[in-house]
Design a protein with these regions (language model features):
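Short, glycine-biased loop/turn motifs at secondary-structure junctions and
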Residues: 1-150
Length: 150
């Protein structure tokens, strides 16, 4: 048995309810990586690529059928512990955005404020301002390509 990572949504991908911590989930039928079976990832970052929701689980895997560098598929899996990491994901996204903010010619103050503070009361305004700026930049690029004035 091996411990790995897995994100869950409201239900399993096949519609079954998420089992309680410590309860074994078993797959019947063929177990083929990227097709059928119970999957898990080697690192939380790898698991994030397949995340159907913000709840990250530390899982124990048994009867492993196939393995790749980033993931595996098994017949039996159980959740050891889980946590809703929504706030951690939002914080990480804001930090990633700030790491490239120097590429943004003139970011609106509300965008900078949100990225630096995570203040939910200004998130919608920041999203709208960033969207407006992105659309303006895209339009300018297309107008230039077509030889038209903005």
């Amino acid at each position: 048995m091996i411990e790995e990572w897995n994100f869950v949504g409201d239900t399993l991908r096949d519609g079954r309810p998420i089992p309680r911590d410590g309860e074994w989930l078993e797959h019947t039928g063929p177990v083929v990586i990227c097709e059928t079976g119970l999957h898990a990832s080697r690192r939380p970052a790898y698991a994030l690529e397949y995340a159907p929701g913000p709840v990250l689980c530390r899982v124990e895997c048994d009867e492993i059928a196939e393995e790749q560098d980033d993931k595996l598929v098994c017949r039996r899996r159980r959740i050891i512990v889980r946590a809703d990491i929504t706030e951690t994901l939002r914080y990480y996204a804001r930090m990633q955005a700030l790491s490239v903010i120097h590429l943004y010619d003139d970011p609106p103050d509300v965008v900078l404020d949100y990225l630096m503070t995570g203040d939910e009361s200004i998130r919608a305004a920041a999203w709208a301002a960033a969207g407006d700026a992105a659309r303006d930049n895209f339009d300018a690029l297309i107008y230039e390509q077509f030889g038209e004035a903005a």
